[in-house]
């Protein structure tokens, strides 16, 4: 995944033969999104990297592969940089950090008397259904310039305290990735015979949390689900 096996070869034992090209296309999104957009005649931007060019045609092949999966923009990286940024992103803003932020804000709202529905809508639903599509299309600066004046002032005042509070966590995370500790943790966890059972228990805990139970209710109330 994103060059994991080859980058951490001393841990995975994956060493490609010297007589083959070793290339990578890394679409910036989930496999389900990549497939859906491909069927719509669109695609995701991707990074590409060449670890070995045994044939002299590795560059041609990797670019063709990127175009073939529908990437509109390709940017060059290395296997090492790709897997470092990927592991950091997954544990950070893409999944780990955002779940932590969701949970913290939801908890504060509930502790101060807000209903589960209100807390979920203000924490998750408005962000994912309204704001992030606008940020994706126009950028965060546009979002700040075009929101209400109360939201604008508050966002400008509070984003730096949030940055300062989370920066040490992100620095620790990147250091763990660079040291190979996150890779080893993933390898060790996935190698255990009871990994699937423990994973199911962790996911069940999240799924049955009040926040995501409220989320299931809110999603079912979306207008498109009641046609």
Regions found by a protein language model. Name each.
Residues 3-88:
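Rossmann-fold dinucleotide-binding core
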Residues 56-111, 117-135:
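Active-site-proximal catalytic alpha-helix in oxidoreductases
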């Amino acid at each position: 995944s994103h060059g994991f096996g080859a980058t951490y070869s001393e841990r995975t034992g994956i060493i490609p033969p010297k007589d083959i090209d070793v290339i990578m296309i890394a679409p910036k999104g989930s496999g389900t999104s990549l497939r859906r957009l491909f069927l719509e005649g669109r695609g995701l931007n991707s990074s590409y990297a060449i670890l070995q060019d045994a044939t002299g045609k590795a560059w041609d092949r990797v670019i063709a592969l990127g175009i073939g999966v529908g990437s509109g923009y390709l940017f060059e990286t290395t296997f090492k940089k790709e897997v470092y940024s990927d592991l950091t992103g997954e544990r950070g803003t893409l999944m780990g950090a955002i779940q932590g932020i969701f949970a913290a804000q939801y908890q504060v709202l509930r502790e101060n008397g807000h209903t589960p529905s209100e807390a979920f809508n203000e924490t998750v639903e408005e962000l994912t259904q309204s704001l992030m599509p606008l940020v994706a299309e126009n950028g965060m600066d546009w979002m700040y310039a075009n929101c209400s004046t109360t939201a604008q002032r508050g966002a400008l005042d509070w984003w730096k305290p949030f940055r300062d509070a989370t920066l040490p966590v992100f620095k620790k995370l990147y250091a763990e990735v660079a040291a190979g500790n996150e890779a080893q943790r993933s390898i060790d966890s996935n190698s255990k015979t009871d990994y699937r059972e423990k994973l199911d228990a962790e996911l069940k805990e999240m799924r049955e949390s009040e926040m995501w139970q409220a989320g299931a209710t809110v999603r079912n109330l979306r207008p498109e689900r009641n046609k």
